[in-house]
Regions:
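Structured surface patches comprising rigid loops and adjacent beta-strands/short helices at the edges
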Residues: 135-155, 213
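Primarily the internal scaffold of c-type cytochrome electron-transfer domains
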Residues: 33, 42-45, 71-103, 151, ...
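Intrinsically disordered, low-complexity linker and terminal regions at domain boundaries
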Residues: 147-171
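Post-cleavage N-terminal segment of exported redox proteins
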Residues: 2-44, 53-54, 65-68, 82, ...
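Acidic, Gly/Ser/Thr-rich repeat motifs that build Ca2+-stabilized beta-propeller blades
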Residues: 185-354, 412-415, 420-428, 478
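Electrostatic cytochrome c docking/interface patches
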Residues: 25-54, 72-74, 84-87, 111-114, ...
Length: 478
């Protein structure tokens, strides 16, 4: 079996795009096209023709513009509202520079010598499905896969400036700027923000630690109780540091970088100390690993210990939750203890884009949910106790750890210290972000709703009350 590199050299992965042609056209540089787009007003009507002409840009082959989301690439119905002109130009000219989450490529090699390249569409215990540039679904049985890896090159071909003229390119950008569907949706809710006004008083953001303290992609911080000086900082790559604000010193507590799977939405994402710390010296982590090709979320308990050689460290790992995902996307982020001393876990739908398996509405899976467990007790065959007042504790088929459902990517969760409310920031699909207050047993809508707007009825349950967000806003606002 040849490694991927050998197959690529042989030219099998032709779906990636013709980088040679791009390199052979120095007179049509990216800089020139960028300059033209910045200084010239194009014709959006002609640009629509370029978009749809498969012998020209051919964008229609992979992208829908009507919200149908039928292609292998993102739906572009709102792209003009989401991106400014500079970002549009960069995305078209250099598609691999910043690939949208959920649209990265996956390369699979089989024991028969076949190589497949596409966007992950579906993953099960028996097979993997990829969607190709022709929006064709390719199914590969798991027992035939000998190698699987994430690609770094977009399925959208490089070198569009070698296939269309400069005038056509400017027209294409003008057409993309007109695609502003989300701005026109009739959303009537006090919680929908069409714009964010400037604050009456400016707010200054200042570094929390001294400038000499540097971190590599810090994603979470946990203060030591009754201690205004020391904090634990977690880095996405798998390291945890004990940091002193006063002395600007940092001490390595944990390094699981060899175990953690680091990517756009994966890595060491959450850390929290036991509510009775340091009397109870347990620390809890949430991170992702690659387990035989499946992205798997781990919620783990460790002990705050001492090492005569290295000082303090997090030791004695004990796995609490192991949640197998479908793709690398939407694994949630935070874990937090509530005022009831229960551990709450935000878990995303795990993809692929648009939640085609309906994880958010499926009570038999932990994906797309807020979970609640008691880590101070144990049930039979479980390393934790399921609280008796969890809303689905008596449900015949539901996972009893579920506290609330209908989430896409609950990246951050936090409890209000005054009201005790659970606030959740949920990342949207193509159009809207949302912030919600989440209570016991509530259904927050994904993928039936995205924010306040309808998204899909495919997995709409019967006779279900959906709880809208407190605030929702278009992605163009940040």
């Amino acid at each position: 079996m040849k490694p991927f590199g050998a197959w690529i050299v042989m030219g099998i992965l032709t779906l990636i795009g013709d980088g040679v042609a791009f390199a052979q056209a120095p007179e049509r540089t990216i800089a020139l096209y960028q300059k033209l787009a910045d200084s010239t007003v194009g014709d959006h009507v002609r640009g629509k023709v370029v978009f749809e002409n498969r012998q020209k840009a051919g964008c229609i082959s992979c992208h829908s513009v009507d919200g149908s989301r039928t292609g292998v690439g993102p739906d572009l119905a709102s792209i003009g509202f989401k991106y400014d002109r500079k970002r549009l130009v960069e995305s078209v000219l250099e598609p691999s520079k910043m690939i949208a989450d959920g649209y990265g490529t996956t390369l699979i090699a089989t024991d028969a010598g076949q190589v497949f390249n596409g966007v992950l569409h579906r993953v099960t215990d028996r097979f993997v499905e990829l969607k190709t540039t022709e929006s064709r679904i390719v199914r590969v049985p798991l027992d035939q896969i000998v190698e699987q890896r994430q690609g770094t090159i977009s399925l959208m071909p490089e070198g569009i400036n070698t296939t269309i003229s400069a005038e056509e390119f400017v027209d294409l950008i003008a057409y993309l700027e007109t695609l502003r569907a989300s701005a026109l949706l009739p959303i009537h809710s006090a919680g929908f923000l069409e714009d964010v006004p400037l604050a009456r008083k400016p707010v200054a953001f200042k570094p929390f630690f001294r400038s000499e303290l540097r971190f590599d992609h810090p994603v979470a911080i946990a203060p030591l109780p009754n201690n205004h000086d020391q904090f634990v900082v977690a880095e996405q790559g798998g390291k945890c540091w004990l940091v002193s604000k006063q002395t600007s010193s940092k001490e390595l507590l944990l390094d699981i970088s060899s175990r953690v799977r680091v990517g756009g939405a994966t890595g060491l994402l959450g850390i929290v100390l036991h509510p009775r710390f340091p009397k109870d010296p347990r620390v809890f982590l949430k991170y992702q690993i690659n387990d035989k090709g499946r992205i798997t979320t781990i919620v783990e308990e460790r002990q705050w210990g001492a090492n005569s050689q290295t000082g303090r460290e997090l030791v004695s790992p004990r796995e609490l939750l192991r949640i197998v995902g479908s793709t690398q996307d939407h694994n949630g982020g935070s874990i937090a203890f509530g005022p009831d001393s229960m551990l709450y876990v935000g878990m995303g739908d795990s993809g692929p884009q648009r939640d085609p398996e309906g994880h958010g509405q499926d009570l038999t899976t932990l994906l797309g949910k807020i979970l609640r467990v008691d880590i101070d007790g144990k049930d039979k065959d479980l390393p934790y106790r399921i609280p008796g007042d969890n809303p689905f504790h008596e449900h015949p088929t539901a996972r009893k750890e579920i506290w609330a459902l209908g989430f896409r990517e609950p990246w951050r969760i936090s409890f209000d210290s005054q009201t005790k409310d659970l606030w959740v920031g949920d990342v949207g699909q193509d159009r809207f972000e949302e912030v919600a207050i989440v209570r016991k047993g509530e259904n927050h809508g994904w993928n039936v709703y995205e924010g306040f707007a309808g998204f899909s009825n495919q997995f709409r349950p019967k006779e279900t009350k959906f709880v809208p967000p407190i605030v929702s806003y278009p992605r163009s606002l940040g």
